[in-house]
């Protein structure tokens, strides 16, 4: 059941749910084994490793693993003698489709077996599939391995928010989530630049060798320097140890059988289908994510064909989006937790909806950036103008994404991973499908009206964001989902 917002910042959050299952609880609110009571250093080591993992792996708003490869698509098509532009677009977007399915596995596994084992298994598999991408001998083989790389690369982005909920009380989560998202924010700026120069000088396969080296290193650090953070898993392990060392038969642990695992697998789907809040947020996110991926998959052709950039230099066209992401992330990190504390002092307690005022601004900001970008390219104005426009889009992106993730984590703290996974399904499908029509739309309408349509799409969904802010608490309490 959805955890009441007012209780989300107490160290015994998960304790009450464990007691209901007759599982051992924390030894007082100051129990040092409770991740909420760990030292700041231990908490931030986990945050740092997750942030670097999201930088290399995948998901929100053109992370490194998907954006770094975009500049190399032209060379890949030439090597494989592939003239079908739709198929070469799929090579980039299929990774995002994998991210739609991966969270449906990562979230329940993390909530059944723990965060640590989920990070470890998925990171190792992602590294293997990335190597397979690098040795692909035809485009079909590459598409298949890119899909599975997306599936297995989803763990840090799916359960990163859940890890933050494990480690931090509500009024501290905004800053922690900002750091977890930092890798995703800078990846659009660094990924394509690195990918462009790697492709130009060493070939497109070296993009995957670089990802393999970086992610392999991060996986080793994750195995060595992180530990389990999920309260249910920690308490279940404690109960299991106590059963072996005591005669108290009442000490039980939650065993994992097929029925329980299946129930965990369907939890994200239940949230998506039965929670109106979860569904509305996911639909809005699918549109925003799709719009961003239309831009990401067309930046390289725009700057190579319209502004005659080389493959290496064309990666610089992504800098605006990355810088805009960073500015938006900085604004959120500086204001969100302070606003939550102020609202708690004013009303007596903080609500998840107090994360959302910034999200209401996202639609107009994204639309303004799309108008700027599209008509600058259409008029062939100096290349700096579309880069500035994409930076405004990046700013609006963070205005939407950060409050959205924080809202889901605060609304479903115990099952934050499932809440984010439910959102990821629609959002990643939007990011995979909408770009397939992007180039054809630009060919038919031009960049001016093509991006104007995307801007109007961003504006159409803004009233829904206002409705969530005003009526979200009522909807959450009226339609609670038994999890």
Curated annotation (Swiss-Prot):
Bilayer topology term: Multi-pass membrane protein
Encoding gene, per UniProt annotation: hepF
Pfam families the record matches: MFS_1
GO cellular component term of the entry, any: plasma membrane
Name of this protein: MFS-type transporter hepF
Amino acid composition bias (Basic and acidic residues), ranges on this chain: 7-17
PROSITE patterns per record: MFS
Record Gene3D superfamilies: MFS general substrate transporter like domains
Gene knockout outcome: Does not affect the biosynthesis of heptelidic acid.
PANTHER family, per database record: MAJOR FACILITATOR SUPERFAMILY, MULTIDRUG TRANSPORTER, PUTATIVE (AFU_ORTHOLOGUE AFUA_3G01120)-RELATED
Subcellular location: Cell membrane
UniProt source species: Aspergillus oryzae (strain ATCC 42149 / RIB 40)
Main location: membrane
Protein function: MFS-type transporter; part of the gene cluster that mediates the biosynthesis of heptelidic acid (HA), a sesquiterpene lactone that acts as an inhibitor of glyceraldehyde-3-phosphatedehydrogenase (GAPDH) and a growth inhibitor of the salt-tolerant lactic acid bacteria in soy sauce brewing. Might be required for efficient secretion of heptelidic acid.
């Amino acid at each position: 059941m959805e955890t009441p917002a007012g209780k989300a910042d107490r160290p015994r959050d998960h304790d009450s749910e464990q007691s209901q299952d007759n599982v051992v609880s924390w030894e007082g609110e100051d129990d040092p084994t409770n991740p909420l009571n760990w030292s700041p250093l231990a908490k931030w080591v986990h945050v740092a490793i997750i942030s670097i993992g999201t930088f290399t792996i995948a998901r929100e708003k053109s992370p490194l693993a998907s954006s770094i490869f975009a500049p190399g698509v032209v060379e890949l098509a030439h090597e494989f003698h592939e003239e079908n532009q739709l198929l070469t677009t799929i090579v980039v977007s299929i990774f995002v489709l994998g991210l739609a399915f991966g969270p449906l596995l990562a979230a329940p596994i993390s909530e059944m077996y723990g965060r640590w084992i989920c990070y470890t298994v998925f990171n190792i598999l992602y590294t293997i599939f990335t190597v397979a991408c690098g040795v692909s001998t035809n485009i079909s083989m590459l598409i298949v391995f890119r899909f599975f790389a997306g599936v297995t690369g989803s763990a840090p982005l799916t359960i990163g928010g859940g890890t933050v909920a494990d480690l931090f009380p509500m009024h501290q989560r905004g800053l922690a989530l900002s750091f977890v998202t930092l890798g995703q924010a800078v990846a659009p700026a660094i990924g394509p630049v690195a990918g462009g120069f790697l492709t130009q000088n060493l070939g497109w396969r070296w993009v995957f060798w670089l990802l393999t080296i970086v992610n392999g290193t991060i996986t080793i650090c994750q195995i060595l320097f992180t530990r389990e953070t999920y309260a249910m898993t920690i308490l279940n392990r404690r109960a299991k140890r106590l059963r072996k060392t005591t005669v108290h038969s009442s000490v039980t642990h939650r065993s994992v059988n097929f029925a329980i695992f299946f129930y965990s697998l369907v939890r994200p789907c239940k949230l998506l289908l039965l929670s109106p809040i979860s569904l509305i947020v996911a639909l809005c996110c699918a549109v925003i994510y799709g719009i961003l991926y239309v831009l990401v998959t067309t930046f390289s052709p725009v700057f190579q064909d319209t502004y005659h950039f080389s493959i290496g230099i064309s990666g610089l066209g992504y800098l605006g989006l990355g810088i805009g992401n960073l500015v938006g992330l900085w604004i959120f990190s500086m204001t969100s937790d302070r606003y939550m504390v102020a609202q708690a002092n004013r009303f007596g307690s903080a609500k998840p909806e107090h994360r959302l005022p910034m999200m209401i601004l996202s639609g107009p900001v994204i639309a303004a950036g799309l108008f700027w970008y599209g008509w600058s390219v259409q008029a062939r104005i100096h290349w700096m103008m579309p880069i500035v426009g994409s930076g405004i889009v990046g700013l609006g992106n963070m205005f939407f994404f950060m409050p959205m993730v924080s809202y889901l984590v605060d609304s479903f703290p115990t099952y934050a991973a499932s809440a984010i996974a439910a959102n990821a399904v629609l959002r990643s499908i939007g990011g995979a499908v909408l770009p397939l029509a992007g180039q054809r739309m630009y060919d038919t309408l031009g960049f001016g009206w093509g991006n104007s349509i995307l801007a109007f799409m961003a504006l159409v969904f803004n009233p829904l964001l206002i409705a969530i802010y005003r009526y979200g608490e009522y909807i959450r309490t009226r339609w609670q989902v038994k999890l």
